[in-house]
């Protein structure tokens, strides 16, 4: 992501020239004073852009991320195409206002991050911005989690934010942002008749300039049985397909999301992957991915409780729920948060000084 950011901000002359000549570019590096009703996007992204008219109309969003990595869906080529599509929308404005109306979200009950009821450390954050005192983008989702928890409304459906086109069975060319590069059999897109080579232009009436624009439409649909109407060009003709998604269609791999760490239960430890030579020396079954406890955060009650129960720095997790551990550190964290509640115990198998130990990790958040 740093490489992509540098390419956009400094190195790519086409992007710089286009931005300077046709846009008023503003670079925002934190969320402290941002109008959260106006600027609604996936706050877990490492890099995001929004394109607006001076009257607040949203033309487009750009920036997509997944467990595949920060740049799997982004490219200079598709960013430039999005920018040129935005210029076309701007030239047609306000005649095309209807196709843009849904691009701005419903007003929030608060204006900025520091007004969010769930935002922690608000007094400290209200001070001057510094490296250790800024509101990160993912902190917005963190605060949303806290609000939902306080209101007793926390549920998994709220976690499936900004679903990828892949959830419809569509793979979009990252070099274009709208062109379908693959259609997966058995998914809604294939059932509706979309084909490789189709170029998406609208979703539920909204103009599309990027993958992120499609994600915005999908984000605002429920995780129950739902429909979305996609318009596309196929060769020299326009087509329209209605996709029908089954309940649970938004569920996806959220292990990469920074805001995942704020969801309870919190482990308050660093369980890190081990180097291959060390893994081999343990002589574990094929496919086991051990995690080493490198750090226990005793500044938090969750960490103190784990340590009191017997967890030690240097312990190696080799099993969970009486099965060999076969997941990454991120997926281990995700599994716990999606399958356990505060007050539960997480059954693990540890290696300590060469001996296997059963350890029931207390997932408590109070001393």
Functional labels for PLM-detected ranges:
Residues 1-4, 130-141:
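The canonical Cys-X-X-Cys-His
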Residues 15-34:
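Thiol-based oxidoreductase modules, predominantly thioredoxin-like and allied folds used
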Residues 41-50, 315:
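Structural micro-motif
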Residues 80-125, 147:
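Post-cleavage N-terminal segment of exported redox proteins
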Residues 201, 216-256, 309-312, 318, ...:
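PDZ-domain C-terminal substructure recognizer with occasional recognition of PDZ-binding tails
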């Amino acid at each position: 992501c740093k490489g992509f950011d540098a390419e956009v901000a400094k190195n790519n002359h086409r992007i710089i020239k286009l931005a300077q000549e046709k846009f008023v570019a503003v670079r925002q590096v934190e969320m402290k004073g941002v109008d959260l009703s106006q600027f609604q996007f996936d706050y877990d992204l490492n890099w995001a852009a929004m394109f607006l008219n001076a009257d607040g109309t949203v033309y487009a969003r750009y920036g997509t991320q997944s467990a595949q990595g920060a740049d799997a869906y982004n490219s200079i080529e598709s960013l430039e195409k999005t920018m040129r599509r935005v210029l076309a929308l701007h030239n047609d404005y306000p005649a095309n206002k209807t196709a843009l109306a849904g691009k701005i979200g419903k007003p929030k009950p608060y204006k900025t991050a520091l007004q969010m009821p769930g935002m922690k450390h608000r007094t400290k954050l209200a001070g001057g911005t510094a490296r250790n005192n800024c509101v990160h983008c993912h902190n917005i989702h963190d605060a949303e989690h806290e609000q939902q928890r306080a209101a007793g409304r926390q549920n998994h459906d709220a976690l499936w934010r900004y679903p990828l086109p892949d959830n419809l069975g569509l793979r979009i060319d990252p070099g274009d942002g709208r062109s379908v590069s693959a259609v997966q059999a058995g998914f809604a897109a294939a059932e509706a008749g979309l084909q490789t080579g189709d170029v998406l232009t609208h979703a539920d009436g909204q103009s599309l300039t990027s993958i992120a624009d499609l994600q915005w439409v999908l984000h605002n649909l429920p995780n129950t049985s739902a429909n979305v109407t996609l318009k596309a060009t196929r060769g020299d003709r326009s087509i329209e397909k209605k996709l029908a998604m089954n309940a649970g269609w938004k569920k996806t791999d959220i292990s990469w999301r920074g805001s995942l760490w704020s969801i309870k239960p919190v482990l308050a430890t660093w369980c890190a992957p081990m180097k291959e030579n060390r893994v081999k020396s343990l002589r574990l079954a094929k496919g086991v991915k051990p995690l080493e406890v490198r750090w226990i955060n005793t500044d938090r009650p969750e960490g103190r409780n784990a340590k009191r129960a017997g967890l030690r720095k240097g312990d190696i997790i080799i099993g969970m729920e009486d099965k060999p551990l076969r997941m990454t550190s991120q997926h281990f964290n995700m599994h716990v948060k999606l399958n356990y509640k505060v007050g539960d115990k997480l059954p693990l198998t540890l290696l300590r000084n060469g001996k296997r130990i059963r350890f029931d990790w207390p997932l408590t958040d109070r001393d």
